[in-house]
């Protein structure tokens, strides 16, 4: 092999290795920053179509209804713990260490984003509350359309009381 061909071959191999390394790093970064949406039932039993269950330590988003009577606040800090459920019977615990949204209340639909700290326990970094009767994030609407019935709120809940 003459030196010119050898140089071209070396350059081509180096280019292929470099592009492969960049593609691998890009896919790894995208995979680690991916927030998958789950319902409480899917966290417990896995997704219906694939059976995929989130792993402890994985960043996820969870949507469901706050279980009435489940909210426990720590009087010494901002720490709050509550359960969310769906109509299929799945229920998980969500812990949160910040201020809850003004529209957050029991019986309300929410989306919580965070890390699964134990099976069935989400350490939330963000909690979003549904802000009116009609709006809902698309993935929550899809999941709730399959597994939730419209709830009737009593007057105390409509006025923002717990």
From Swiss-Prot:
Pfam families: CcmE (PF03100)
Subcellular location: Cell inner membrane
GO molecular function: heme binding; metal ion binding
Ranges of the Cytoplasmic topological domain: 1-8
Binding site for heme: 131, 135
Main location: membrane
BP terms from Gene Ontology: cytochrome complex assembly
GO cellular component: plasma membrane
Transmembrane segments: 9-29
Sorted UniProt keywords: Cell inner membrane, Cell membrane, Cytochrome c-type biogenesis, Heme, Iron, Membrane, Metal-binding, Signal-anchor, Transmembrane, Transmembrane helix
Ranges in the topological domain labelled Periplasmic: 30-162
Database matches in SUPFAM superfamilies: Heme chaperone CcmE
Membrane-topology annotation of the record: Single-pass type II membrane protein
Family: Belongs to the CcmE/CycJ family.
Its job: Heme chaperone required for the biogenesis of c-type cytochromes. Transiently binds heme delivered by CcmC and transfers the heme to apo-cytochromes in a process facilitated by CcmF and CcmH.
HAMAP family registered for this protein in UniProt: CcmE
PANTHER family: CYTOCHROME C-TYPE BIOGENESIS PROTEIN CCME HOMOLOG, MITOCHONDRIAL
Protein name: Cytochrome c-type biogenesis protein CcmE
Species classification: Bacteria, Pseudomonadati, Pseudomonadota, Gammaproteobacteria, Alteromonadales
Gene: ccmE
């Amino acid at each position: 092999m003459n030196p010119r061909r050898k140089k071209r071959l070396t350059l081509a191999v180096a280019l292929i290795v470099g592009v492969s390394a960049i593609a691998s790093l890009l896919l790894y970064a995208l995979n680690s920053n991916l927030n998958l949406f789950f319902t409480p039932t899917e966290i417990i039993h896995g997704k219906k179509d694939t059976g995929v269950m989130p792993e402890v330590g994985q960043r996820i988003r969870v949507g469901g209804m706050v279980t009435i009577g489940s909210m426990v606040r720590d009087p010494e800090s901002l720490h709050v713990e509550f359960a969310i459920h769906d109509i299929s019977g799945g229920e998980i615990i969500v812990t949160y260490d910040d201020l809850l949204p003004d529209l957050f209340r029991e019986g309300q639909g929410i989306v919580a984003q965070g890390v699964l700290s134990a099976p069935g326990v989400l350490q939330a970094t963000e909690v979003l509350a549904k802000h009116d009767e009609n709006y809902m994030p698309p993935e929550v609407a899809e999941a709730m359309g399959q597994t939730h019935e419209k709830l009737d709120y009593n007057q105390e809940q409509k006025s923002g009381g717990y």
